[in-house]
Amino acid sequence: TGSFGKTFIKYLLKKKYPFKKIIIFSRDELKQHEMSQSSDFNEKNFKQLRYFIGDVRDKDRLNWATKEVDYIIHSAALKQVPTGEYNPFEVIKTNIVGSQNVVESAINNNVKKVISLSTDKAVSPINLYGASKLCADKLFISSNNIKGKKKISFSVVRYGNVMGSRGSVLPEFLKQSQRGYFKITDKQMTRFNISLSEAVDMVIWALDNTIGGEIIVP
């Protein structure tokens, strides 16, 4: 139900891929309700859509949600850096343990391919968010070695800040522009940015081309 998820699903629906169903798995009841009431994601207009309330921390629920599923795009994460520093236990439960639950559920249910969304902050991490995503990346890549004879692959798509996504800097800059000034941390600071459409294109490419063990970067 986040920025990426909505854009990704809209792309799939527009391209009319021959899928039987798309399961939208998230823990926020309100966001799911609002999304399901939208004309873009209404179950009456799109019979393939299914809305599941659940949390990646809850392995039992995740197991149920991924039964008879061929592909998983794992985008659940706590990603606000300051919040993560103040709530480290919660970040670990979602970003690391939650990722492990996705891996185990995928293997148990014979999923064909799993793509996990990562971040440039996982490279030489300097905060808990980056460190937790690095751990998650390691879990997904190494899972290609523990799957046994099951025909399942795990890959990672690692990109930077997605422009316009919830919690990104661009909406904040737009607000500041209305006040006539920009508050920045350092003049030498740089950010790696891609658009939502570019992020979706990367995941589509990964679904079509990865064989397991790759970390895809822009």
What residue ranges belong to the model's regions?
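Conserved Rossmann-fold cofactor-binding substructure of NAD(P)-dependent oxidoreductases
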Residues: 50-71
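Residues in the short beta-alpha loop(s) of Rossmann-like NAD(P)-binding domains
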Residues: 28, 38, 120
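N-terminal Rossmann NAD(P)H-binding glycine-rich loop of SDR-like oxidoreductase domains
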Residues: 1-17
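NAD(P)-dependent short-chain dehydrogenase/reductase
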Residues: 126-129, 134-214
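Conserved residues in the N-terminal Rossmann fold of short-chain dehydrogenase/reductase
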Residues: 26, 52-53, 93
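Conserved Rossmann-fold NAD(P)-dependent oxidoreductase catalytic core, especially the SDR/UDP-sugar
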Residues: 71-74, 78-82, 86-134, 138, ...
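Conserved glycine-rich Rossmann-like NAD(P)H-binding loop of the short-chain dehydrogenase/reductase
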Residues: 17-34
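Hydrophobic/aromatic anchor residues within beta-strands of the central parallel beta-sheet
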Residues: 51, 91, 114, 154-157
